[in-house]
């Protein structure tokens, strides 16, 4: 008997694949890997993704295959939830670990209550300017490309975002652990930087894991290798 769950990954109608993106992979690296697996198994399929994750972030990435790629825009409207760690008392130009620390400060005098209240004060709608180290387009180039060339675009258009929930889950100074749920288009790196500014000591995003996109959960995701294996198994079942 053919396992319909297995062959669904080869359906021309397409499907959503929930993938746990590894550290240091770009979102396109994941797409390319899955697209290559289809091609090697004789099944050319369109593959796209919803909600870019930075290379230094891990967690849930939704891939759409086949005709499902036409529905990606609807998925991008969904709220996203993350768990992560902010390093207080230091800054980086990228607001994460992609660049070197500077402006280091001692933070032993920071009050835990003040940290939690600062996070709570950020909940709600706010305008957010995309960071230079981002995939936003400017005059035909990505901002991160310009940043790597040493250029800064000061007139980056701010966008309205909403922080629905921002909970501090642990404090081990200089590190602060958090859970956050945000609207489409929010940069968690910028939120980490802004929290550091509110506290007067600076801060950057040390680590980040996306745990949910709308109703889709990281707990239901597969590793990249597991998805590749599933495509290979499905192809072998059909050949039999």
UniProtKB/Swiss-Prot annotation:
It comes from the Bacteria. Its EC number is 5.4.99.25. It holds the Pfam family TruB_C_2. The active site is at residue 54. One of its GO terms (biological process) is tRNA pseudouridine synthesis. Responsible for synthesis of pseudouridine from uracil-55 in the psi GC loop of transfer RNAs. Keywords: Isomerase, tRNA processing. SUPFAM superfamilies: Pseudouridine synthase. Belongs to the pseudouridine synthase TruB family. Type 1 subfamily. This is tRNA pseudouridine synthase B. InterPro entries: PsdUridine_synth_cat_dom_sf, PsdUridine_synth_N, tRNA_psdUridine_synth_TruB, TruB_C. It catalyses: uridine(55) in tRNA = pseudouridine(55) in tRNA. One of its GO terms (molecular function) is RNA binding.
């Amino acid at each position: 008997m053919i396992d319909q769950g297995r062959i669904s990954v080869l359906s021309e109608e397409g499907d959503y694949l929930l993938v746990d993106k590894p550290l240091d992979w770009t979102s396109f690296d994941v797409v390319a890997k899955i697209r290559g697996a289809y091609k090697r198994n004789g099944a050319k399929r369109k593959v796209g993704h919803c909600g870019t994750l930075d290379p230094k972030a891990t967690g849930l990435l939704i891939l759409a295959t086949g005709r499902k790629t036409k529905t990606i825009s609807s998925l991008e409207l969904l709220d996203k939830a993350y768990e992560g760690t902010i390093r207080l008392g230091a800054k980086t130009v990228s607001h994460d670990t992609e660049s070197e620390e500077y402006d280091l400060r001692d933070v032993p005098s920071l009050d835990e209550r003040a940290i939690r209240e600062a996070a709570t004060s950020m909940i709600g709608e706010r305008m957010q300017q995309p960071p230079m180290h981002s995939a936003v387009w400017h005059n035909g180039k990505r901002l991160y490309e310009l940043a790597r060339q040493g250029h800064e675009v000061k007139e980056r258009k701010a966008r309205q975002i909403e922080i629905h929930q921002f909970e501090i889950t642990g404090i081990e100074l200089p590190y602060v652990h958090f859970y956050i749920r945000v609207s489409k288009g929010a940069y968690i790196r910028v939120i980490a930087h802004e929290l550091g500014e509110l506290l007067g000591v600076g801060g950057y995003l040390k680590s980040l894991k996306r745990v949910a996109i709308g109703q889709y959960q990281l707990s239901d995701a597969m590793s990249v290798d597991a998805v590749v294996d599933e495509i290979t198994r499905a192809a072998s079942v059909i050949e039999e």
